[in-house]
Design a protein with these regions (language model features):
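Glycine-rich oxoanion-binding loops at beta->alpha junctions
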Residues: 1-14
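Glycine-rich phosphate-binding loop signature in dinucleotide/nucleotide-binding domains
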Residues: 13-21
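Mixed-charge interfacial surface used for oligomerization/domain docking
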Residues: 20, 29-39, 43-49, 55-222
Length: 222
């Protein structure tokens, strides 16, 4: 109820000055914030575009800044949605975790999947995107951490247009790992200005645990 009231109060305040709002909350697959925003928007009779990112963290920030840039360019709401939606639909996040128990406890991964991974000593490469409906799922399973890292890099390089894709390497207190991935991508030709390193937000890090690396990527043409 506290979250509902905070969103309600914010929307009431925004309604005084704006006729259209873009909201970029945590994906529907991990949170009810988006549906709460839609419900409040209907109640207050507001024109709110709630964007489902099918993701978290850096991609939310990227799209919010992108929308602001398009607004400053005097794009209409329809034009903005037409520009950003294909990029969102094709965006992806790969997740490499040290310990699956955090995801299991938080209900983000089934106990069976976590137990099987531990028993077989495998390293799952997780992903979250439109195809997973914004939920964390297993993309592949390999035998060593080094192979998991290599698989993630190869998968991303196969997916992207290196000149027009932004790669966000986010981590939970594992800067050394993030720097390693950045070096790998630059060596493969990704422009350094298209690679960004940041922390995983705390609301997500409590589920992933320390030492996690997530690599998020989205296409944006100038």
């Amino acid at each position: 109820m506290a979250a509902y009231q905070k969103i309600y109060d914010l929307f009431e305040e925004l309604k005084k000055d704006y006729d259209t709002i873009f909201a970029v909350p945590l994906t529907n697959g991990l949170s009810t914030n988006a549906s709460t925003m839609q419900s409040i928007a209907r109640e207050l009779e507001m024109n709110v575009h709630v964007i489902d990112m099918y993701a978290t963290c850096a991609l939310e920030k990227h799209v919010a800044i992108w929308i602001k840039k398009l607004v400053d360019e005097h794009k209409s709401s329809e034009e903005i949605l037409k520009i950003i939606q294909p990029a969102i639909d094709e965006s992806n996040s790969l997740i490499l975790v040290k310990n699956l128990q955090h995801l299991k406890r938080g209900g983000r991964l089934t106990p069976m999947a976590a137990a099987l991974a531990g028993l077989l000593k495998i390293y799952p490469v997780l992903h979250i995107n439109k195809s997973t409906e914004g939920r964390i799922d297993v993309l592949n399973k390999v035998r060593t951490e080094k192979r998991a890292d290599a698989y993630a890099i190869d998968k991303i390089m196969d997916d992207i247009d290196i000149q027009h894709t932004h790669i966000y390497i986010i981590h939970s207190n594992f800067l050394e790992g993030a720097d390693h991935f950045k070096k790998c991508f630059t060596e493969k030709g990704v422009p350094e200005q298209n690679i960004h390193i940041d922390y995983i937000s705390s609301v997500i890090a409590v589920h992933t645990g320390l030492g996690c690396i997530a690599i998020q990527y989205i296409r944006e043409e100038n």
